[in-house]
Amino acid sequence: MNLLVVGSGAREHAIAWKLSSSSIVERLYCAPGNAGTAGLGVNLNLRADDIPGILGAVLDYDIDLVVVGPELPLSLGLTDRLKQLRPAKPPLCFGPSAAAARIESSKSYAKSFMRRRGIPTADFRVFDDLGEALRFIQSPPWPFVVKATGLASGKGVFLPESPGEAGTILESLMKGKSLGDAGSE
């Protein structure tokens, strides 16, 4: 069985390490992988979000199973695209569809999902207008958390200590695009 692990972090190294010990694994590839995965298989010079490149590698290396670690390729629909590849023999894929991954890739979607289904979660407000957000932070309840809605590589959560600090954060996210589109809400 030929396997492809997508990602370059410690999580993907741990997955590749465990998979490499299986007797059914013939070849192990990682895209892009890291120094640790290089000793376990072959690192491919592909970014985890290079969906066309990954699809090409699946065909070129006759991949049977793809394990996707990072959230970004999941949110970009990698598993959905893999299921459409090679209709006669699509590769198996370990990872959710783009629709299912949305619960991780969109904080506003996740919080709304929990509210609709009665799942306990902290109170929240979603703003796509900077002016409305700035008006909201001027009144209690304090303290609160400012979160970028999209994927921000662990950098999208802020604990401001004052309305002024919260305003600076909101302006940086929504106007300055400090986290790109992740901070649009």
State where each predicted segment sits.
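Acidic/polar helix N-cap motif
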Residues: 47-50, 106, 129-130, 162
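Short beta-strand-to-turn element immediately C-terminal to the catalytic PLP-Schiff-base lysine
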Residues: 7, 127, 157-162
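Generic secondary-structure signature for well-ordered alpha-helical cores
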Residues: 21-24, 59, 63, 84-87, ...
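A conserved helix-loop-beta module that forms one wall/lid of the active-site cleft
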Residues: 90-156
